[in-house]
Swiss-Prot record:
Keywords: Endoplasmic reticulum, ER-Golgi transport, Golgi apparatus, Phosphoprotein, Transport. InterPro entries: NO_sig/Golgi_transp_ligand-bd (IPR024096), TRAPP_component (IPR007194), TRAPPC6/Trs33 (IPR037992). It is found in: Golgi apparatus, cis-Golgi network; Endoplasmic reticulum. The gene is Trappc6a. Its main location: Golgi. The keyword Endoplasmic reticulum applies. The keyword NAD does not apply. This is Trafficking protein particle complex subunit 6A. The modification Phosphoserine is found at residue 33. GO terms for biological process: COPII vesicle coating; endoplasmic reticulum to Golgi vesicle-mediated transport; vesicle tethering.
Amino acid sequence: MADAVLFEFLHTEMVAELWAPDPDPGSGGKRRSLSVLEGLGFRVGQALGERLPLETPAFREELDALKFLCRDLWAAMFQKHMDGLRTNHQGTYVLQDNSFPLLVTMGSGPQYLEEAPKFLAFTCGLLCGALHTLGFQSLVTASVASLPACKFQVVIQKS
């Protein structure tokens, strides 16, 4: 439990630091901040993608890799399982978390929906990095319709 709280504090501070007012407003500030958060998440996802599946054989199917993310990776990061996994069987998957830990502490008013994406960028990178390590190129986007629920859309790139 203490690890979860420490991670939440670390994540909040990363977002706050990267979203602090930029003294050079012409440098692409917010877009660059999202890229930095995604990059950090990507690297963490790569490391977890190497370490967590040591007992399991290599994932040959996309669906098996996504199930691994929903169960094992999510439990390692957030001490819970993903609430839903849907697919169109054409390389697009939607992962749903009805109580995403990094959004639970936010208020539920509509004004907070604008702030939510910056709290999801790290996790998008995390999922993308883990999939990369497992051998799947992907594009991950997040959306929030009502707090604290969120959806991550994963599109597997066909080579």
